[in-house]
Each structure stands twice: as C-alpha cells, then as structure tokens.
From Swiss-Prot:
It comes from Clostridium botulinum (strain Kyoto / Type A2). Pathway: Amino-acid biosynthesis; L-histidine biosynthesis; L-histidine from 5-phospho-alpha-D-ribose 1-diphosphate: step 4/9. PANTHER family: 1-(5-PHOSPHORIBOSYL)-5-[(5-PHOSPHORIBOSYLAMINO)METHYLIDENEAMINO] IMIDAZOLE-4-CARBOXAMIDE ISOMERASE. The lineage of its organism: Bacteria, Bacillati, Bacillota, Clostridia, Eubacteriales. The gene is hisA. Belongs to the HisA/HisF family. Gene3D superfamilies: Aldolase class I (3.20.20.70). SUPFAM superfamilies: Ribulose-phoshate binding barrel (SSF51366). This is 1-(5-phosphoribosyl)-5-[(5-phosphoribosylamino)methylideneamino] imidazole-4-carboxamide isomerase.
Amino acid sequence: MIILPAIDLKEGKCIRLYQGDFKASKVVAEDPIEVALKFKENGAEYIHIVDLDGALTGEIKNLSIISSIIKTINIPVELGGGIRNLNTIDMLIGAGIERIILGTAALNNRGLVEEAVKKYDEKIAIGIDAKNEKVAINGWLNVSSINYIDFAKEMEKIGVRNIIFTDISKDGTLKGPNLKQLEKLNESISCNVIASGGIKDIEDLKVIKEMDVYGAIVGKAIYSGNINLNEAIKIINKGSSK
C-alpha cells in the first residue's frame, strides 16, 4: 500500500481544514516546497496536492508553487482542485503532474471524464468526496443526491482506474477514517481505491492495508506528529509489495 502525504494549498501556504470547512482552516507551514522536500526525505514515493483556492473558484490558483514543487522533489505528484476542462488537464500534465484528480467536473461533466481517460488513461483519478454517502462538489460546499458507490461504478464503466475516497465528516478530525464506507467501496469496484480523511495513526493505516486498499492519503496526522511518515512507510511496506 502506498502512503501519500498531503499538501493543501491556500494562498501559497500549506493549510489544513476541519471537516472541509474553509472557515476552520489553519496554516501548518509557510513554505510548501520545504514541506514537500521533507516528505521526500522521509521516503514518500508520491505526494497528494490540493489547490483549495482552485476548488472554490474553478481555476488553478497556485500553479507557480505547484510547478516549483514538481521541479524540486522529482517524485510523482497528483493534483486536485479547480480542474474543470481538458485544456487545464493538458497544461498540468505538460507541467509534470503525474495524476490529475477530477471531482466536481466529473459529476457535472461525464464527457470530460471520457475524453480525459481516453487521452491520459491511468493519469486521471476521480476524487469522490462524500457526506452521508452522497457526493459533494464545489469545494465541498454543495452535496448532490448521488450515492458515492453508484458514482464510483459509473466512473469505472467509463474506464477510470483510480478513485480517491474522502468522507468529509472525518477529514481533518484525527478521529479515524470511515472504514465501513471505505470497505464497501473497495469491494464494489475493481479500481485502485485511495483512502482519505480522518486517518489518525499507524493503526488506522494497518487496518486500511488489511482491506487491500491501494493507497492512503495522510495529512493532519503527519503535521500534528501523530504519524511519523518515515516509520509509517517502513511499517506498511514491510513484507508487502502492495
């Protein structure tokens, strides 16, 4: 199982949200490039970045910092937040982003997902952010009537290979992930599932690994010191190729 440390960008700084609430944001680092380098030094093989300004506005806002991170760390980066059209996807892949996460755009524009997957295959991931099992969009400000499993199955039919699942009520809380929903999703589709939201310690990571989930995104638990990234990667990778 792969562990992806998370960087959430707002106005050029590293921040953490609580349950997706932009009013409950806290700056955890002034220099995201330094944070990314530290993640790499601690053994990260992949970094998860969200442009929170982009998620709200529908346009990538932190591109210069994201580009600097890619050039500096030289390990794969996946990016989500505000990616709403194929031109933006082309530009970001051209800038060196390894995997693009579509969230709101995937729900509002199935045609975009089809085009993007046809062109970039596994470089396209779908971010499914759920609240009470319903898919949320627009920086988590609006909740749709669509069930998260139904949506995941629809994306799989299109050809999507990677799904990032977040239970919003758990995100940034350090109260543990929604294991029940995660397991249900992982059993319902054959895509790679990446767990996100609420992971608080190494025990959570062990449980997620036992479910045969492809990856786990860890944010607040690293910044708060609950998880030592280097140790976690060693423990989770011990005796395992997945």
